[in-house]
């Protein structure tokens, strides 16, 4: 023991004594008269040894135990050692009183467990206190104990709390009600003022509205129901309440609402349920507390009718909408055998009550039962409940109640409106009630009397139009829908979906199938049948379309309208109410001087008196749209956007039309208006086109100015009672009042008209009355997309930073466009507003009002070409229609929506006459794609300028794709730029985009194809499966792919061919070591199932998966042990030690040849009880292999255990998914080429397991180097922190395994292996999917650093492995035989490519040739002959002789001009001799590195033989393998691995060896007498300071040398004296000595060599060997006997023979 260790030990003893003395003082203070110390010598310090008399704690009695009532006592005996508290004390119990033997034993067990737990800490006081607690627990409780008082006080306290709670309960309820009232008032104020914060929860009628963060634009309406009851103060008073019926009904209601939450495909007029939650907090008879939450989904823009009914009731058309949508919702419920049960004002929700007018109804099926439940609960609490059998209400009665409640709701809306101008007065019976218009009152009465909902569907009140123009049944087309027409007879009109220049689109519900449809209504010209046929062309086009991504067409028909002759001015008649006396009346319409009213004149124009088809109200919208300009999408005017006024003037100057004056007046006099104002369709331009086509009609040409002025008035005015008005944004229908400016303009127009009509009264057509004609409309019934438009979807931020959703929508849009373009059709108005989304996330293209045929298509491809040559409506109505040359198709340029129009549509048709193509749709789709990827743009000039920049300069904003990954953003930008090219020919087609492999689009066709392929693939024996595989294998591989597949690996092999040679050398060296340890070589099959490969896949690499002809997926091996495991379980192998060499494969990033690596796999399988010894031998073999293959390198052996990692995972309580990610991260840390800092580990682990867990695990167990004891102590400290028993068990097992493995390994390792540093790291992890059942180890070699100032190089992992028992269980099949004895399997793998690379680097740094010249190799060739002969016979005759002598020879078949041309081949192939046949006379040129001469064949062979002898003389230096010598000239490779010999069988020396010793022994094959071990003279060469130590082991060393050289000495004669110099110098030094010196070397040569070696190997002491070598050589020179000298290395039995 060193002096420092002694000092440390003394300090530790003093510290222990100090702690014991301090503990004694504490014990004396607590147990003064009850503790007795036992000492043998009072003046000498001894460890604590005491008796403590202990009794129960005094707190178990009220006043202590003065009378000694407690009879329980025991003496605690504690005996400590000198190392206490570092070592636990001995504990015993003496003289127990009042305790049974079982209690004493239990107490003693508890105390000893405490001593084990508290090891390292003072524990006597804790033991004594635990004894007193135990006695207290076993002391019987006497009367009047403190425990009884505590219970009594607790009862009194609880009673007082109950009384106070009951006293304050009523006050709390009152305060709660007041708070609710105040909260509702505040909510109402916030709603009206618009001051609500975003994401703030609202409360309406006691119900909360919560914003859903995960569902944008959606809120939850949560109804909270709390049932609370507490019994009276005195439980004995009153009868207990029976809540069993209530609880039973509560469960029934809950189940019913739960079923409502599961309904899919709910009607759009009903509010969907989100969830229902029931929480029974307390259900005892004295205490009831139950909470029930019912959640429904509402939109953020929806408001409850309780807040907005004042705005709704003032407009009769909104009441009609409410009634119609309520009928639709109730009809859905009734057809589904459900009822609403509580249709009140609070269950009605509306969106944009002054705009969109969508009503939805909540609480269906839930509010009624819940209210009944509340009533029942109140009756039970008040004692009024009487149990009775409730008759189940009939379905018929419940439906009637719903209808009655609907009528009550409508009636209440009228009566509850303050300041209403309506009076509930019965309508007179006489006369026509429809004209007297008490329709609402009749409808309400019918609701209260109807027996089923079908009676309400046919009510006249619902057949009135839901329009904004008037409070009557008039359409915006100058007539009223006929109640007997198909529109109203078959459908219920719900609401208007949108309006434009074509007409409008209404949402209807079919009475027969209860399905919603969208019906487009287009006015027909009562004057021109030809024009009507052109208008009907849209329906014909529409009927031809049938595609999942196109809005579906159902039916089309024409319907007559009821002509309007006179209007009433009673604004309220439609509500079924009579005017209240004193109410202000609206004045009559202005009269013309002819006596006709202005309204009559307007009707005349509408019904065909004028040439324009533009309805009156739409004309007002077109001309007066500047009132509310909105920078959204609009359709361009049919003049040029750059100058509409100039273009219109030019058109006016070219022709004179009835509307020409109007256009001149309206356009030229509006210079101050915005030039960008536009509308959907230029109806005046259409009229001009019609006039051009009907120019033969002389009556139309002779219309006078009076008629024009009348049309001026009709075009600039609209109905006075309009509440709907079209905004400039074509997707908006807004509710607004007429502006004062508009009224002023109308008044001015009327005055101007009166003046002009007066001055032109004498004209022949001034005020002629045109007979009234019945107006007609075209109705097109289409599919209704119930979700939204893409415009709304983008504005609600659903597409921003959602590339998957964007590409999905875009792909479906392209599918629809491809379908249209394949049918030679162009949409011409692609924009987000015309792209519709369905509830099933489908995407459909709609609005084909501007569709046309492609001019470049042939007639045979034109859809519907047999009908007429004309195409779409607008194409024929526009004055800019261009008829392409050689085509019957007219094209209109100035159509569509300006922001989405392609640049070629803005070019003047007079300059650019080429027809446009379907590429204009591609351009528009590109703008749509840009909007989906870009942030939502508000409807302002910012949006206009951004989209205009796309068209003008293709200028994409810099923040485009800011929230996307860089590759995705770049892909989106490139796609948009391609689609927005100004040149149409440079834009891709829809088919090009769909087939672009770079775009991540998944169309429905792709999904269908994938489903079909899955079915085919799953049916392996199917006909289609075989066909599919056959097509794949027969598919021709492109030439480029054929070339590129393996070009890289071919070049790499040629570049690093020398490493392949080193791999073969390593294989030979590894075989020698493994054979010594009795490992047998076992080749297993190559391919394996993919499941096996994936189960054991590495962290970074993936297996190479291939498909065989039968369709079975297989994989190439990622390591060589996976199939070995399958071999073992199939053959029930119990014991085996095997190794194998082979290539392993992994995937490459490119589509090329898999990545290949050489691997040496060593494994052993055996019983689990033998696992420590097997694993220790694996460690030993691994170290020997690495030291032998990389001599002189610095190695580090890292040892860990998988169960230590598992214990840490359980300590952190990580889930299975997180566990896998943690193991992968630890694997990357373990195989890293350098140590990681704490920060680097945190950065790698935090994303996997969180910052807290990462901080814990990085500081938990720090690696310990070369000290297993210290590592064991750290693990013990970690074990104390564990709270999970299973984790402690894992730690204990891991430490036991490591202790036994490391002990065996250290016992068996040699001196060379001792130089390897060992690091014990509990977080060592390697390929966790494979090695995860026990020992884990890695060997790292430190590569020299290439940086000058960096002394430490990078660590390279060259070998790793461990235990993998779970692989046996994973691969075992039920048919495999299983032994009763459990098995274990362990192994490791050597990265031979890495080892060869390092070895190559070492050779280069030491200037060692790539291929050592340790054998002779001959190249035979011939010189060029004059006759051109090849001398092939002479060359092979020469080669035959050399081959018979066992000399390696190669024939060069082509004659050469100059031997110098073979220099490169000679160096690469390591050729020693070149024999060139010179002529037919058998003259041969023999060329070596030093000479070149001409000789005959025999002389050449002799020269080669001498070279062989010279090389073999140097190569006779041998090393043992299996007990016998192996010539070092053996060619590396598998042929010389001696695998065919049984381990331990000596290998006979080769022929070359026998010939090489011919200089020493006789050449005859039979030796009469051979040398034995007695000829050996063993000399121990050592330094003076180690001489005595070595001499003690001389006999053991001599015995070792004789045992290993037994067979070697047999090759010498009996007279040969063999001097064996046993030394401990490195093997490479020995090799250098025997290669440079001989027995005849001079002393100067010897000293020179040894001086060089000493200078190069300064740390190696060569002086003793030099001295002994001189002595031995002097003895040889003086003696006459034959002497052989051997240099022998004791540590690894390495030896070399000196020639």
UniProtKB/Swiss-Prot annotation:
<keyword id="KW-0067">ATP-binding</keyword>
<keyword id="KW-0418">Kinase</keyword>
<dbReference type="InterPro" id="IPR006575">
    <property type="entry name" value="RWD_dom"/>
</dbReference>
<feature type="domain" description="RWD">
    <location>
        <begin position="22"/>
        <end position="138"/>
    </location>
</feature>
<keyword id="KW-0810">Translation regulation</keyword>
<keyword id="KW-0346">Stress response</keyword>
<dbReference type="GO" id="GO:0034514">
    <property type="term" value="P:mitochondrial unfolded protein response"/>
</dbReference>
<feature type="domain" description="Protein kinase 2">
    <location>
        <begin position="508"/>
        <end position="999"/>
    </location>
</feature>
<feature type="region of interest" description="Disordered">
    <location>
        <begin position="632"/>
        <end position="725"/>
    </location>
</feature>
<dbReference type="GO" id="GO:0060378">
    <property type="term" value="P:regulation of brood size"/>
</dbReference>
<feature type="compositionally biased region" description="Acidic residues">
    <location>
        <begin position="669"/>
        <end position="706"/>
    </location>
</feature>
<dbReference type="GO" id="GO:0005829">
    <property type="term" value="C:cytosol"/>
</dbReference>
<dbReference type="GO" id="GO:1904808">
    <property type="term" value="P:positive regulation of protein oxidation"/>
</dbReference>
<dbReference type="InterPro" id="IPR008271">
    <property type="entry name" value="Ser/Thr_kinase_AS"/>
</dbReference>
<feature type="binding site">
    <location>
        <begin position="497"/>
        <end position="505"/>
    </location>
    <ligand>
        <name>ATP</name>
    </ligand>
</feature>
<dbReference type="GO" id="GO:1903935">
    <property type="term" value="P:response to sodium arsenite"/>
</dbReference>
<keyword id="KW-0808">Transferase</keyword>
<dbReference type="GO" id="GO:0001934">
    <property type="term" value="P:positive regulation of protein phosphorylation"/>
</dbReference>
<feature type="region of interest" description="Disordered">
    <location>
        <begin position="572"/>
        <end position="615"/>
    </location>
</feature>
<dbReference type="GO" id="GO:0009411">
    <property type="term" value="P:response to UV"/>
</dbReference>
<dbReference type="GO" id="GO:0042594">
    <property type="term" value="P:response to starvation"/>
</dbReference>
<dbReference type="GO" id="GO:0034198">
    <property type="term" value="P:cellular response to amino acid starvation"/>
</dbReference>
<dbReference type="InterPro" id="IPR016135">
    <property type="entry name" value="UBQ-conjugating_enzyme/RWD"/>
</dbReference>
<feature type="active site" description="Proton acceptor">
    <location>
        <position position="829"/>
    </location>
</feature>
<keyword id="KW-0547">Nucleotide-binding</keyword>
<dbReference type="Pfam" id="PF00069">
    <property type="entry name" value="Pkinase"/>
</dbReference>
<dbReference type="GO" id="GO:0009408">
    <property type="term" value="P:response to heat"/>
</dbReference>
<dbReference type="GO" id="GO:0034063">
    <property type="term" value="P:stress granule assembly"/>
</dbReference>
<dbReference type="InterPro" id="IPR011009">
    <property type="entry name" value="Kinase-like_dom_sf"/>
</dbReference>
<protein>
    <recommendedName>
        <fullName>Eukaryotic translation initiation factor 2-alpha kinase gcn-2</fullName>
        <ecNumber>2.7.11.1</ecNumber>
    </recommendedName>
</protein>
<dbReference type="GO" id="GO:0010629">
    <property type="term" value="P:negative regulation of gene expression"/>
</dbReference>
<dbReference type="GO" id="GO:0032057">
    <property type="term" value="P:negative regulation of translational initiation in response to stress"/>
</dbReference>
<feature type="binding site">
    <location>
        <position position="520"/>
    </location>
    <ligand>
        <name>ATP</name>
    </ligand>
</feature>
<dbReference type="InterPro" id="IPR050339">
    <property type="entry name" value="CC_SR_Kinase"/>
</dbReference>
<keyword id="KW-0723">Serine/threonine-protein kinase</keyword>
<dbReference type="GO" id="GO:0005524">
    <property type="term" value="F:ATP binding"/>
</dbReference>
<dbReference type="InterPro" id="IPR017441">
    <property type="entry name" value="Protein_kinase_ATP_BS"/>
</dbReference>
<dbReference type="GO" id="GO:0004694">
    <property type="term" value="F:eukaryotic translation initiation factor 2alpha kinase activity"/>
</dbReference>
<feature type="binding site">
    <location>
        <begin position="114"/>
        <end position="122"/>
    </location>
    <ligand>
        <name>ATP</name>
    </ligand>
</feature>
<dbReference type="GO" id="GO:0061063">
    <property type="term" value="P:positive regulation of nematode larval development"/>
</dbReference>
<dbReference type="GO" id="GO:0005737">
    <property type="term" value="C:cytoplasm"/>
</dbReference>
<keyword id="KW-0677">Repeat</keyword>
């Amino acid at each position: 023991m060193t002096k420092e260790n002694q000092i440390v030990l003394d300090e530790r003893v003093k510290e222990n004594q100090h702690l014991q003395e301090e503990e004694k003082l504490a014990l004396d203070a607590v147990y003064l008269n009850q503790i007795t110390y036992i000492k043998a010598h009072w003046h000498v310090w001894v460890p604590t040894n005491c008796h403590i008399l202990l009794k129960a704690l005094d707190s178990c009695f009220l006043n202590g135990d003065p009378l000694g009532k407690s009879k329980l006592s025991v003496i605690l005996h504690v005996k400590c050692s000198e190392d206490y508290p570092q070592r636990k004390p001995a504990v015993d119990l003496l003289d127990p009183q009042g305790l049974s033997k079982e209690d004493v034993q239990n107490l003693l067990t508890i105390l000893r467990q405490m001593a084990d737990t508290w090891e390292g800490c003072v524990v006597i006081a804790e033991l004594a206190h635990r004894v007193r607690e135990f006695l207290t627990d076993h002391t019987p409780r006497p009367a009047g104990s403190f425990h009884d008082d505590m219970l009594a006080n607790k009862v009194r306290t609880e009673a007082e709390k109950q009384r106070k709670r009951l006293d304050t309960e009523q006050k709390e309820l009152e305060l709660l009600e007041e708070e609710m009232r105040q909260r509702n008032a505040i909510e109402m104020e916030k709603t009206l003022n618009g001051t609500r914060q975003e994401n703030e929860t609202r409360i309406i009628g006691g119900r909360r509205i919560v914003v859903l963060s995960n569902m944008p634009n959606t809120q939850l309406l949560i109804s909270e129901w709390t049932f609370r009851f507490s019994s009276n103060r005195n439980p004995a008073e009153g009868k207990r309440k029976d809540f069993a019926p209530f609880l039973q009904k509560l469960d029934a209601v809950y189940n019913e609402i739960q079923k409502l939450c599961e309904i899919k495909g709910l009607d759009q007029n009903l509010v969907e349920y989100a969830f229902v939650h029931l929480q029974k907090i307390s259900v005892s008879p004295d205490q009831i507390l139950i909470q029930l939450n019912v959640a429904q989904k509402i939109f953020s823009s929806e408001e409850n009718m309780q807040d907005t009914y004042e705005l709704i009731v003032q407009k009769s058309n909104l009441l009609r909408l409410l009634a119609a949508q309520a009928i639709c919702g109730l009809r859905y419920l009734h057809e589904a055998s459900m009822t609403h049960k509580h249709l009140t004002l609070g269950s009605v929700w509306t969106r944009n009550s002054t705009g969109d007018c969508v009503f939805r109804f909540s609480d269906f099926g839930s509010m009624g039962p819940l209210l009944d439940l509340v009533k029942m609960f109140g009756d039970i609490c008040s004692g009024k409940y009487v149990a009775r059998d409730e008759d189940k209400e009939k379905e018929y009665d419940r439906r009637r109640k719903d209808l009655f409640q609907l009528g009550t709701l409508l009636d209440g809306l009228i009566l509850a409106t303050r300041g209403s101008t309506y009076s509930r007065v019965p309508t007179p019976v006489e006369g026509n009630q429809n004209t007297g218009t008490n329709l609402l009152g009749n409808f309400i009465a019918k609701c209260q009397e109807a027996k089923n909902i079908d009676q309400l569907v046919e009510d006249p009140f619902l057949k009135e139009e839901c329009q904004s123009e008037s409070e009557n049944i008039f359409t915006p087309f100058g007539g009223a829908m006929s109640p007997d027409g198909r529109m109203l007879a078959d459908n219920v009109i719900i609401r208007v979906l949108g309006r434009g220049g074509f007409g409008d689109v209404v949402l209807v519900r079919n009475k027969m199938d209860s399905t919603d449809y969208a019906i487009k209504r287009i006015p027909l010209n009562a004057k021109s049948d030809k024009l009507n046929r052109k208008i009907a062309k849209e329906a014909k086009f529409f009927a031809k379309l049938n595609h999942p991504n196109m809005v579906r067409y159902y039916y089309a028909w024409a319907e007559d309208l009821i002509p309007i002759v006179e209007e009433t001015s009673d604004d309220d008649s439609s509500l079924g109410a009579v005017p209240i006396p004193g109410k202000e009346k609206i004045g009559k319409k202005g009269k013309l001087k002819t006596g006709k009213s202005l309204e009559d004149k307007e009707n005349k124009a509408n019904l065909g008196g004028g040439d324009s088809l533009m309805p009156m109200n739409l004309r007002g919208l077109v001309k007066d749209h500047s009132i509310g300009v909105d920078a959204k999408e609009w359709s361009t005017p049919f003049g040029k956007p750059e100058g509409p006024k100039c273009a219109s003037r030019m058109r006016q100057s070219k022709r004179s039309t009835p509307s020409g004056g109007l256009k001149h007046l309206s356009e030229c006099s509006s210079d101050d208006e915005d030039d960008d104002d536009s509308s959907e369709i230029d109806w005046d331009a259409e009229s001009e086109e019609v006039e051009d086509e009907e120019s033969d009609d002389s009556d139309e040409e002779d219309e006078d100015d009076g008629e024009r002025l009348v049309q001026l008035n009709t075009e600039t005015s609209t109905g006075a009672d309009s509440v709907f008005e079209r905004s400039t944004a074509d997707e908006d229908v807004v509710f607004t009042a007429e502006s004062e400016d508009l009224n002023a303009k109308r008044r001015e127009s009327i005055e101007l008209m009166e003046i002009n009509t007066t001055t032109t009264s004498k004209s022949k057509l001034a005020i002629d009355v045109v007979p009234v004609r019945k107006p007609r409309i075209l109705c097109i019934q289409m599919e209704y997309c119930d979700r939204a438009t893409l415009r709304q979807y983008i504005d609600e931020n659903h597409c921003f930073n959602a590339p998957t959703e964007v590409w999905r929508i875009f792909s479906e849009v392209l599918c629809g466009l491809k379908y249209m373009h394949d049918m030679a059709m162009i949409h011409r108005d692609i924009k987000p507003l015309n792209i519709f989304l369905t509830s099933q996330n489908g995407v459909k293209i709609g609005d084909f009002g501007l569709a046309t045929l492609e001019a470049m298509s042939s007639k045979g491809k034109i859809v519907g070409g047999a009908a007429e040559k004309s195409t779409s409506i607008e194409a024929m109505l526009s004055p800019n229609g261009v008829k392409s040359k050689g085509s019957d198709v007219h094209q209109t340029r100035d159509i569509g929506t300006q922001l989405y129009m392609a640049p070629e549509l803005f070019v003047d048709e007079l300059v650019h006459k080429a027809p446009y193509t379907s590429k204009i749709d591609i351009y528009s789709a590109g703008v749509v794609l840009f909007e989906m990827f870009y942030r939502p743009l508000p409807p302002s000039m910012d949006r206009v300028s951004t989209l205009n920049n796309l068209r003008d300069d293709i200028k994409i904003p810099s923040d485009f794709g800011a929230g996307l990954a860089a590759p995705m953003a770049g892909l989106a930008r490139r796609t948009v730029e391609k689609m927005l090219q100004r040149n149409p020919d440079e834009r891709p087609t829809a088919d090009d985009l769909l087939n672009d492999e770079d775009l991540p689009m998944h169309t429905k066709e792709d999904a269908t194809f994938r489903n079909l392929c899955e079915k085919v693939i799953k049916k392996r024996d199917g006909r289609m499966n075989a066909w599919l595989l056959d097509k794949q294998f027969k598919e021709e591989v492109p030439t480029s792919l054929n070339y590129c597949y393996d070009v890289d690996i071919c070049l790499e092999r040629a570049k690093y061919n020398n490493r392949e040679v080193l791999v073969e050398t390593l294989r030979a060296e590894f075989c020698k070591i493994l054979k010594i340890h009795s490992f047998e070589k076992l080749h297993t099959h190559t391919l394996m199932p993919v499941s096996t490969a994936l189960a054991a896949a590495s962290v970074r690499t993936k297996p190479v998966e291939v498909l065989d002809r039968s369709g079975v997926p297989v994989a190439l091996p990622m390591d060589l042990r996976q199939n070995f495991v399958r071999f073992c379980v199939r053959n029930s192998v119990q014991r085996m030690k095997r190794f194998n060499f082979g290539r392993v494969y992994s995937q490459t990033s490119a589509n090329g040849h898999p990545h290949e690596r050489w691997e040496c796999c060593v494994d052993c399988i055996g019983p689990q009880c033998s696992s420590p010894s097997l694993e220790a031998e694996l460690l030993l073999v691994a170290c020997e292999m690495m030291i032998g293959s990389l001599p002189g390198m610095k190695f580090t052996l890292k040892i860990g255990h998988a169960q230590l990692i598992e214990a840490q995972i359980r300590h952190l309580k990580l889930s299975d998914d997180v566990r896998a990610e943690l193991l992968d991260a630890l694997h990357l840390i373990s195989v890293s080429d350098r140590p990681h800092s704490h920060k680097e580990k945190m950065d790698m682990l935090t994303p996997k397991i969180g910052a807290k867990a990462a901080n814990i695990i990085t500081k938990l167990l720090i690696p310990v180097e070369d000290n297993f004891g210290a590592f064991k102590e750290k693990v013990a400290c970690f074990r104390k922190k564990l709270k999970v028993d299973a984790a402690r068990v894992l730690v204990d097992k891991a430490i036991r395994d490591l202790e036994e493995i490391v002990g065996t390994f250290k016992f068996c390792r040699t001196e060379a292996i001792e130089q390897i540093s060992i690091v014990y790291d509990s977080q060592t992890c390697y390929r966790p999917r494979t090695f995860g059942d026990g020992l884990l180890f890695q060997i790292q070699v430190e590569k020299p650093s290439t940086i000058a100032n960096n002394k430490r190089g990078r660590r390279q992992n060259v070998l790793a492995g461990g235990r993998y028992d779970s692989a046996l269980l994973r691969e075992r099949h039920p048919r495999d035989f299983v032994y009763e004895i459990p098995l274990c399997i362990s192994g490791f793998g050597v990265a031979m490519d890495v080892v060869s690379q390092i070895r190559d680097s070492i050779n280069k740094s030491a200037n060692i040739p790539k291929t050592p010249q340790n054998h002779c190799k001959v190249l035979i060739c011939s010189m060029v002959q004059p006759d051109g002969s090849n001398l092939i016979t002479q060359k092979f005759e020469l080669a035959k002789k050399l081959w018979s002598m066992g000399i390696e020879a190669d024939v060069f078949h082509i004659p050469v001009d100059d031997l110098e041309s073979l220099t490169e081949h000679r160096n690469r192939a390591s050729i020693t001799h070149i024999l060139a046949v010179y002529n037919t006379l058998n003259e041969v040129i023999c060329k070596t590195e030093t000479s070149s001469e001409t000789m005959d064949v025999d002389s050449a062979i002799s020269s080669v033989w001498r070279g062989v002898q010279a090389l073999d003389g140097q190569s006779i230096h041998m090393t043992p393998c299996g007990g016998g010598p192996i010539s070092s000239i053996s060619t590396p490779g598998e042929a010389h691995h001696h695998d065919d010999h049984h381990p331990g069988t000596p290998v006979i020396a080769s022929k070359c060896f026998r010939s090489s010793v011919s200089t020493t022994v006789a050449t005859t094959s039979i030796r009469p007498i051979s040398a034995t071990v007695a000829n050996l003279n063993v000399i121990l060469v050592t330094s003076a300071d180690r001489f005595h130590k070595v001499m003690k082991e001389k006999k053991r060393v001599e015995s070792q040398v004789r045992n290993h050289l037994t067979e070697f000495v047999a090759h010498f004669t009996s007279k040969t004296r063999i001097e064996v110099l046993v030394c401990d110098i490195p093997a490479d030094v020995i090799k250098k000595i025997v290669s440079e010196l001989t027995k005849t070397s001079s002393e100067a040569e010897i000293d020179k060599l040894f001086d060089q070696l000493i200078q190069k190997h300064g740390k190696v002491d060569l002086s003793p060997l030099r001295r002994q070598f001189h002595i031995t050589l002097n003895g040889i020179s003086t003696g006459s006997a034959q002497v052989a000298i051997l240099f022998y290395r004791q540590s690894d039995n390495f030896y070399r023979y000196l020639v």
